[in-house]
Amino acid sequence: LLQIITGDATKGQNLIHHPCIADVHITGSIASHDRIVWGDDPRAQATQKLRGEPLLAKPITSELGNVSPWLIVPGRYTTRELESQAEHIAASITNNASFNCLATRVIVTWSGWPQRDLFLRTVERFLRQTPNRVAYYPGAADRYCRFAGRDGSLEPGQTFPWTLLSAQSIRERPELFTEESFACVCAETCLDSPTPEMFVQEAVSFANDCLAGTLCASITIPRDFQRNHPSGVRAALRDLRYTSLCVNQWSGLAYSLVSPPWGGYPGATLDNAGSGMGAVHNTYLLDRFEKSILTGPLVNYPRPVWFPSHRNALSTARHFIALYQKPSALRLPSLFWAALRG
């Protein structure tokens, strides 16, 4: 039985506590989770957590927020590689007007990387080329002003500019790293590591220890680094505490595949839920999983349909939906042709 009910927070609260409801799953923020489990008042939440007495006496699973990082391993990238990875990041920021838990919120680079400035300018160019979207999500105007550091008020329903804040420090702007903005704001921070090899280790530690969330992360790795430092690459992928890791790709791809598990990294508890407990998707019903790793090329062909620059995205999407409605090998040629024309 599936019944879809719409309404406000009060109706949601009534449904959660209804005697006919045995289990609860939510998608939202950690703040929403804690209000449901521990109560509305922050002081009462702390007391209930200390006592170990949740107000919700039902099992709950969750998929919560994430300050999703994209780590850029320094190297000598070709122009095509640099542009492709920059557009990947721009697409991850602009998709769904940036109202995604997997939107890139922090780009981590090496201060000694010669191509750093060029790369950031390329990301900004792709952002400028993407039309601004209506900030439809409740509270987006206030959050945008706060995280973008803009004074003044913005009206709900306005279009806000895609905003990349370069060279940000966690000491000066901790909110950019420890809170999910859920607005079209992305911060870039650079680490002063002595070598590229040390940067990879320190970037992994920075993502694990300084950024909020464990849901998903992406890392761009040049081919020469993978060839010359295979053990360093394996260690980085092993040590990153994220359930979904994507190499050279946006983590939205792992989400859209549906088969990999999607949720917070193992170890979350009811009083420290992080990016959530439990998982969705997981088509193969894997048990006791830790993470999934998806790898891809530095340059995708054909052009990903989620890139704003894709010239035939709408037609490709329609062919894709038609394939899902009536699966048939006869529908594949038209889908491939639409995608190739992007």
Language-model features, listed with the residues they occupy:
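PLP-dependent aminotransferase-like
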Residues: 1-10
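Residue-level signal for inorganic ion chemistry
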Residues: 2, 24, 66, 110, ...
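Short hydrophobic/charged patches on amphipathic alpha-helices used for structural packing
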Residues: 12-13, 204
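ALDH superfamily catalytic-core signature
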Residues: 17-23, 31-172, 197, 247, ...
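Short, well-ordered beta-strand elements within core beta-sheets of diverse protein domains
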Residues: 71-72, 105-111, 182-195, 214-222
